[in-house]
Amino acid sequence: MNRLGSVWVVVVAVMVASLCIPHPSWGEAQARRDANGEGPASQHALIGGVQASPATQVAQATQATQQDPSGEAIFKRICATCHSSLKPGDTGSAVPGIRALPRELLTQFSPDAILNTLTNGKMQAQAASLTAAERRAVAVYASGRDFGPTIAAPEDVETNLCTEQLVMGDPGASPSWNGWGNGPANTRFQPKAQGKLTAADLPRLQLKWAFGYSNVMTARPQPTVVGGRLFAPSENGHVYALNPHTGCRYWTYKARAGIPTAAVVGRYRDAAGNQGLAVYFGDRKANAYAVDAQTGREIWVRKVDAHAAAAITGSLAFDGTRVFVPVQGLNEEGMGGFAGYPCCTFRGSVSALDANTGTVIWKTYTIGENSPRLPSQDGTASFGPAGGGVWSVPTIDSKRHLVYIATGNGYADPPQATTDAVLALDVDTGAVKWERQLTPGDDWSLGCQQSNGANSACPAMLGPDFHLSAPPVLTHVGDRDLLVLPQKSGLAWALDPAQEGAALWQYRFGLGSGLGGQWGVAVDNDHVYVGVADLLTPTPGGMRALTVADGTLVWQQPPFAKLCGAAPGCSAGQGGPLTAIPGAVLNGSMDGGLRAYSTNDGSLLWTFDTNRDFDAVNGVKAHGGSMDAAGPVVVDGMVYVASGSGGLVGRQGNVLLAFGLP
């Protein structure tokens, strides 16, 4: 094990709520759940498909009685500081600048969706102190409706089965989009032979089918298409194997927590001699998984970090024999200013696992070990350093035998040289070969003042919260390699991997903020395409194209008029991942618009407004919303995009959309 010595929607959603509730210790919270017979969450199962288990057991639940916990009282105690009610004349957030959904707008979600978010999704840390009955009571109150006499099994699990169980094709012989960035370099570029779409085709695209995710408040994960199958993870903890042309379902796998990002597919051979293709992914409780791509059979599960705040929000990377697993700890980032919490102890990391067995080969932390600091003013113990989470998928450089990761900000002093940085790790040992810090001294925690005393769990001086949310993209100009990535500061960077990450160029594409340029660029042979988020500014949105060689501006496109008008959470911000094909670049916006631009001059080629309800092939009530965390996927003449990844900053939705030519 190696130890180095030295938001966006999810950021705001979880950290704001962290500040708003009276957290007990993590151990106390688990003890309380154990006392109520709940214990740790551990459910996982194959549902449906070739090797389907018996019908899902339906949990019985009774109507709320006078003896049940008061959802209103619990909501007011732990939620209302941020999710307060609208005042007369208000149309958006309950808390200006934070934009957490007000109580009135939470009623758009079912109690099942809210309960899933509290139990398995992004709010599980905030609900850690609640019993199952208390979480249900909050879900009923927040949604404004009851569960009814029973909790139905998810609508999308037992329906929409494919009539034929086709054998998967050879991944190398059929078009694919594998993983978050469409390959280990994470360029998000799809060549014509794989995409089978040209810029001239895009205006003729039509909606072919829609798939609704049940019991979720957001559609954040991006799909993966390999071997003639589409793999769609969900925040409800399911992975769906679908027919990419019809949306029918081959199988569904139930993980132990919500899955917030894309899967990657690679070959495996287990100890029993079984072999084939595996779907690799991670969840919000820091579990990594391998599931057979043909049948949905579980191959292995590995918890890669025991810290209660640990979560996997970046996709896993696969190099043929290993999977690389990034871990971040957002749930602790909001605790520095909270009295009574012993902040902070989480450390970001990457683990290399044997792809066949899930065995940990090595684990490298991004920062040094925690040490006790001066107690807080209330006598609570405090620790540091902390933070340095890895939000995004690792990037693999087979030529140099390195894996690159981008790190987040620190949570607590002392500042480290490896936060807000790109690190190069040896693929065999995890040893850090070099690091390049882009913003020094960026220790930041929600609820802290700009300047804080020595006996505070907060950093002495708050940094700007400019962590790196997107992965480094490995590309080249001639015989020179570059690592290109955006930062929340509003800067795009090109680093030289041959010179230990020395900066080759930088370009300011946005004003920058804690919700600045966010989730990823696309790179083709000539250009870097960057979307502008700037969600905290009066004029968010817009697109830029830069030369790969030196970062010179080629064209820029101002934001278009918002498709969502004055709707709460509506923004023109374009911080989501971009996708490039020959002649065009696609991007989903916070206003719910999926747009395609010409790579020549930035002119608009096509727009589709996802702000509506959809008739889903699986019968789930589906609707679109903001698009931010997940990017478009182009493969085999189709375009796939998840709409509704607004978190608590934008507008929620729960739909996967598939477009094709007439």
Language-model features: where?
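Bacterial N-terminal signal peptides
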Residues: 9-20
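Electrostatic cytochrome c docking/interface patches
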Residues: 32, 39, 43-74, 89-90, ...
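Asp/Glu-centered strand-loop micro-motifs enriched in Gly/Pro and often flanked by an aromatic residue
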Residues: 67, 191-226, 230-231, 253
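Periplasmic/extracellular electron-transfer cofactor-ligation site
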Residues: 68, 72-108, 145-150
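Short, solvent-exposed loop/turn elements at domain surfaces
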Residues: 90-91, 184-191, 215-221, 240
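Extracytoplasmic electron-transfer domains, predominantly the class I c-type cytochrome c fold
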Residues: 96-146, 177, 402
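Blade/loop signatures of beta-propeller domains
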Residues: 157-208, 366, 370-371
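Extracytoplasmic/lumenal domain signature
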Residues: 199-214, 239-259, 265-275, 280-310, ...
